[in-house]
């Protein structure tokens, strides 16, 4: 498992991003099915990952006490009007502002170690304060579009 250092984290000002959101609420064991629905909807809407950024916004712990409490938003950046096409899709925004950014290269299926590094190690030592928006990631490239060792995700911890 990769270990992270303060040199891996940069503070970046990010612009607000309008997104289409498919919410996953409930047992993480069913997340794969939600992801497949999201991919199918996204293809039908013409929002290809190369031209429309992909985000995950984690609204719960990775393993909440009750699986029913698991919550993540699957998002795609778009300025287009949202066509739900029979899916539960809503418009939203990832707010802009200062963020601590940590890039993860390789297997990006489990970003929990990187998120825990930001919260438990980097944040207390940095003198920064977290803002009132959950940690999220932008998936810059992902398997199977690229070989697994070339997958890239950036975690964003919103700061005050």
Regions found by a protein language model. Give the residues of each.
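A solvent-exposed interaction/effector surface
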Residues: 1-160
């Amino acid at each position: 498992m990769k270990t992270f250092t303060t040199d891996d984290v940069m503070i970046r000002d990010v612009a607000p991003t309008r997104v289409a959101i498919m919410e996953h609420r409930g047992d993480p064991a069913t997340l794969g099915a939600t992801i497949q629905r999201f991919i199918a909807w996204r293809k039908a809407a013409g929002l290809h990952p190369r031209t429309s950024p992909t985000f995950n916004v984690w609204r719960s712990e990775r393993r909440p006490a009750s699986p029913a409490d698991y919550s993540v938003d699957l998002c795609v950046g778009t300025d287009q009007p949202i066509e739900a096409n029979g899916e539960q899709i809503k418009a939203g925004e990832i707010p802009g502002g200062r963020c601590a950014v940590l890039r993860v290269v390789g297997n990006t299926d489990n970003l929990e170690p990187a998120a825990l590094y930001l919260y438990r190690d980097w944040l207390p030592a940095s003198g920064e304060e977290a803002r009132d928006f959950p940690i999220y990631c932008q998936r810059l490239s992902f398997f199977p579009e690229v070989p697994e060792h070339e997958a890239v995700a950036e975690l964003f911890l919103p700061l005050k």
